[in-house]
Amino acid sequence: MAIRAVTFDVGSTLLYPSPSVAETFVSSAREYGYDIPVEEAESHIDACWALYYEEYRRDGDFWCHHEGCKHIWYIQYALLCERCGVVAHKDDVVDATYRAFLRGHHWGIYEDVVETLRALQDRGVTLGVISNWDTDLLNILADLGLSRYFADIIPSALVGLRKPNPALFELALERLGVSPGECLHVGDADDADGEGPLAAGMHSLIIDRHAGVHAPGLTVIHDLSHVLDYV
């Protein structure tokens, strides 16, 4: 069956933090009198991700509502404050770091994204976004000029469903007007972007921009333009 639609994850698939989380945290802390080397902040990012995955494994449903999305970032930035000795104005630094990433000016677009989206559109493929993200994703994609490529954008917090729940992918299929066998999903996470769409009967590609290790049975690409080989 021919692919009529392609849906995309966002983080580490289409976008990356720019400036980085560490750079943004350092800049936020500087506003309150802290002079923290970027290298020091960067050395604690792995601990922040470890905290994220601990929370995700415990109950990833924080992605289903605004307060949960906000909380998962707040606790990571609070950990950065703790590790970097930010005591006074800790809440202000956490909030400033969080707010910086609510708009597009703090996100970069991978070099292979726009060309790939245009090529898919030229082939008549309908495009969509399915992402575990708060509703600010709508503003971010609009700020970056990417919204125009997508027929539908579904942040998890907007609909109360999160990947890898097949119900979220089924909702996207309904809104895009295609059957599962006509839709390909592309993202970077094995469970959210591999197992989830496959459980919904869709096709899946995992994009690996960081030379990771993936579960057997998943199809992995290393450049977004390779999506064109599967359409």
Indicate residue ranges for each PLM-predicted region.
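Asp-based, Mg2+/Mn2+-dependent phosphohydrolase catalytic module
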Residues: 1-6, 16, 35, 39, ...
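N-terminal helical cap/lid subdomain that shapes the substrate entry/recognition surface
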Residues: 2-111, 123
